[in-house]
Amino acid sequence: MRPVCPDCTSTHTRKKGIRRGNQRWSCTQCRRQFTTPMDYVEENKFPKILLFDIETSLYHMVGWGTYKQYIQHHQITKHQYIISWAAKWLYDDNVQSDVVTPKESKNRDDKRILKSIWKLLDEADIVIGHNGERFDLRKLRWRFISENMQPPSPFRVIDTLKVARREFFAPSYKQDFLTKYFKLENKLSTEFQLWIDCEAGIPKRLEEMVEYNRHDVMGLEQVYLKLRPYMRNHPNLGVLMDEDVCPTCGENDLTETNNEYFTSANRFPIYRCNNCKTPNIRSKKNSNDKGTEVRSI
């Protein structure tokens, strides 16, 4: 339960820290600041941020040769399915994963592992993937609807591939390049035959596939943390936490710089997070207003 502002009786109040054993609050309507006993303090729930990656099978198609040709939908003889997935919660050492059994792989039956990844996506506030928006999530949604599954609860998406392409002029934007260049967790080497063997249901090869998948997720987390200070429009964690914190990492260790950010109408002091090093701005339209909200530039 959120406290009522003693001046305007609004419940639109925001936590501002602790003072002398009491919780400080700020009213977002009239800007009155007040304190309450610690009984009012709600548990601080850090947003559930999920990093994930999937591995898919091949499509099987028929044609009239190996030359360049357009494959039409009626030439598909076997549809694609999900071989494995891997995921981890941000900062959690535990990497979760699931892979089809040899029998499921031979039958191209991925419904069991679709249910397990669906549960994680349904819990998440934010999901992170490399090419996740264009590939992984669209593939999963197609498999969900193909198996008559309902969509998971809505979440925000951070696509590290889109971030890298938008913010940098690198020689390559593949995760394999980024992890090697920045000396992060490297992807494991694979070959095309691995996918053939997984479809054949060879147990050892299915284990190799999911291990490859798990390494991808560990590398993805490191890529995300490396790129994070440069991410514009990162989902505002302060909104999810209902706290006046760094919108990028959720920490409250902010230092005001001597610089300001200008728009056509206002100017804002720039703060830098001492944890993730991201520069942010705090709402402050003139010198008499006290900064109340931190957001990304």
Residue spans of the language-model regions?
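Conserved RNase H-like, two-metal-ion catalytic cores of nucleic-acid enzymes
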Residues: 40-121
